[in-house]
Amino acid sequence: MNLVLMGLPGAGKGTQAQKIVENFPIPHISTGDIFRAAMKNETPMGIEAKKYIDKGELVPDEVTNGIVKERLAQDDTKDGFMLDGFPRNLNQAAALDEMLAESNRHLDAVINIHVEPDVLVERLSGRFICRNCGATYHKLYNAPKVEGTCDVCGHHEFYQRDDDKPETVKNRLDVNIKLNTPLVDYYQKKGVLHEINGEQDIDKVYEDIKKVLTNLN
């Protein structure tokens, strides 16, 4: 079972990835993890990627593609894998098709956890911090027990980090939506896309994903 897991920041992709690998015996291949592993193990592509990362530059597609290809060549992917964070654009999607075709494999499903942008802004911009002790809260998921009073130190002054402010979150989401939309269209045309409603509770989202994956087996 060869999968790609997609979803905008705040859609709950990390939580669902964890649930999938707990219940299906396939490796979770996150691009962040494989970059770190490739650099640590000094693979040819890891050495190449490190040059860009050390300079604070974006890693070119061909290097990212090479690192994914190295990882997909490992034995534990023989019976399937779940890619998370790749592909990020249409060039990478085409490269993935090519590398799978070379080893007589194909994608079985692309799971896209869909959450409306305004809900994502609310989820991602709800965090606030006690100015006195640094305790972190979220207005939806982890509000103080007494409104306006820190549970930890009893102070009443809170602030929000700049990157948690709604306008910053919205800008970050806009960038991701621009990358995501062509990929959703691409996989829809290929007939492998499964849209999952990510606005349900966590267990219900997983139930819907599980139904898709069970039908693939």
UniProtKB/Swiss-Prot annotation:
Residues given in the record as Zn(2+) binding sites: 130, 133, 150, 153
Catalytic activities: AMP + ATP = 2 ADP
Cited InterPro entries: Adenyl_kin_sub, Adenylat/UMP-CMP_kin, Adenylat_kinase_CS, Adenylate_kinase_lid-dom, P-loop_NTPase
Biological or metabolic pathway of the protein: Purine metabolism; AMP biosynthesis via salvage pathway; AMP from ADP: step 1/1
Chain intervals for the UniProt region annotation (LID): 126-164
Broad EC category: transferase
Keywords, alphabetical: ATP-binding, Cytoplasm, Kinase, Metal-binding, Nucleotide biosynthesis, Nucleotide-binding, Transferase, Zinc
GO function terms (MF aspect): adenylate kinase activity; ATP binding; zinc ion binding
Binding-site list for ATP: 10-15, 127, 136-137, 200
Segments for region (NMP): 30-59
Positions of AMP binding: 31, 36, 57-59, 85-88, 92, 161, 172
Subcellular location(s) per record: Cytoplasm
Keyword Cytoplasm: yes
GO cellular component terms, A-Z: cytoplasm
Protein purpose: Catalyzes the reversible transfer of the terminal phosphate group between ATP and AMP. Plays an important role in cellular energy homeostasis and in adenine nucleotide metabolism.
UniProt name for this protein: Adenylate kinase
Species name: Limosilactobacillus reuteri subsp. reuteri (strain JCM 1112) (Lactobacillus reuteri)
Gene this chain is encoded by: adk
